[in-house]
Amino acid sequence: GRTSPYAFQGLRDEGVEILIDIGKKYNIPVVTELTSIEQVKKYGNKLDIIQIGTRNMYNYELLKEVGKLKTPVILKRGLSATYNEWLLAAEYIKNEGNNNIILCERGIRGFDPTTRNILDIAAVPYIKKNTSYPIIVDPSHATGTRYMIRPLSIASIAAGADGIMVEAHIRPEKSLSDARQTIN
């Protein structure tokens, strides 16, 4: 993943522009992560959904900037964020006028290195009971392990998740990022 500065970092702005072009050409919705205020200003109104990744959940200036738009936002939970911290991060977006927020449980940091993270399935019913936000689950990042994606997807839907987000590639083993947790 992008935790290492030596890992593939994605195509950045060029990649966002490619996605926008593909979305227009094939009339498909485009969701991608934006990591800077500059990117939000440049691409925020051109995307169907903006994703705020786990490392930026605490980037309050970035959250305020996406809050100024009407574009829906997927807000991923921080690696060690409590439910309250996650919901307060959503408030930064909401307080700027954007109520189109989708929360994404993507696993929290644990001590056992067997899986990349630990899927907090309890987050789903908690968010459903205590907020009006839709919640989706990312079992790919929660485990970092391909064979766990299907059973955790089923568990997430059973717990009440509004959707699932998974890493996919036509040839997962060739994926430049997150190959171990990518399905075909």
Regions found by a protein language model. Give the residues of each.
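Active-site/ligand-binding-proximal alpha/beta "capping" segment
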Residues: 94-155
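Conserved, mostly hydrophobic/aromatic
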Residues: 43, 75, 127, 138, ...
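Active-site beta-loop-alpha junctions enriched in small/polar residues
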Residues: 1, 35-37, 55, 78-80, ...
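Catalytic cores of alpha/beta
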Residues: 38-46, 83-89, 144-161
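Glycine-enriched alpha-helix->loop->beta-strand junction motifs that scaffold or abut catalytic
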Residues: 42-51, 67-73, 94-100, 131-134, ...
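Catalytic beta/alpha-barrel core
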Residues: 28-36, 48-61, 71-83, 102-106, ...
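Glycine-rich phosphate-binding active-site loops on the catalytic face of alpha/beta enzymes
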Residues: 54-58, 156-181
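Glycine-rich, proline-tolerant flexible connector loops at the mouths of alpha/beta enzymes
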Residues: 1-14, 169-182
